[in-house]
């Protein structure tokens, strides 16, 4: 079973990511548990329980603790968790390499669903 966290301060994007991920997992007959968080602070509040996640979809532009800082904190716990940045801002892409992000997906693209499927493969 895959454990997935989705962290985005915009509910619409959290729901969209979840919808596409669930569709992909259903097509591949993969069981999963998906948790959603509205801030990096909320996600990091899990402490070492973060280690239970296989994949974390993470927005970059969030209040209090942005996605880049959240990813750095996640990396303090584990280098094995796949981090996928999902953002509307292309200018942060280089920052993703500093935390060994798996992918960098742009929210406002026409083929966002395809990007999620490619990422999950």
Describe the role of every protein-language-model region.
Residues 1-3:
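Non-catalytic signal-transmission and effector/linker regions of two-component phosphorelay proteins
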Residues 8:
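Conserved acidic carboxylate
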Residues 11-35:
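Two-component/phosphorelay signaling modules centered on CheY-like receiver
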Residues 18, 36-55:
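Acidic, metal-coordinating helix/loop segments flanking the phosphotransfer/catalytic sites
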Residues 20-24, 46, 73:
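A generic secondary-structure signal
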Residues 53-121:
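CheY-like receiver
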């Amino acid at each position: 079973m895959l454990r997935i966290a989705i962290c985005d301060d915009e509910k619409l994007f959290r729901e969209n990511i979840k919808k596409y991920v669930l569709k992909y997992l259903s097509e591949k007959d993969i069981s999963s548990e998906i948790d959603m968080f509205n801030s990096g602070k909320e996600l990091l509040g899990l402490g070492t329980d973060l280690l239970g996640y296989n994949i974390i979809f993470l927005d970059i532009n969030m209040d209090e603790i942005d996605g880049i800082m959240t990813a750095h904190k996640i990396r303090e716990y584990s280098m094995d968790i796949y981090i996928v940045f999902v953002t509307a801002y292309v200018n942060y892409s280089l920052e993703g390499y500093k935390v060994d992000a798996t992918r960098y997906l742009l929210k406002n693209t026409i083929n966002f669903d395809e990007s999620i499927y490619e990422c999950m493969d």
